[in-house]
């Protein structure tokens, strides 16, 4: 499952992202964040972190540097 999700994200990065433009307000970009989170924490926890990140990605959020956490703790 982890490999499948990372492959889908890479396909998005190479096929769709160039057409949509690079407008991510965060560093690393949301797709790079997703690959890192899934690679570190697996499909389920990585997807959870990615969904939380995508919910913050909107015009009213200032953005900035938002790395994947080193370890998951109580939040």
Curated annotation (Swiss-Prot):
UniProt KW keywords: Cell inner membrane, Cell membrane, Membrane
GO cellular component: plasma membrane
Pfam families registered for this protein in UniProt: YidD
InterPro entries, alphabetized: Membr_insert_effic_factor_YidD
Membrane topology: Peripheral membrane protein
Compartments (UniProt record): Cell inner membrane
PANTHER family recorded: MEMBRANE PROTEIN INSERTION EFFICIENCY FACTOR-RELATED
Family as reported in the entry's similarity comment: Belongs to the UPF0161 family.
HAMAP family in the cross-refs: UPF0161_YidD
Function noted in UniProt: Could be involved in insertion of integral membrane proteins into the membrane.
Protein name in UniProt: Putative membrane protein insertion efficiency factor
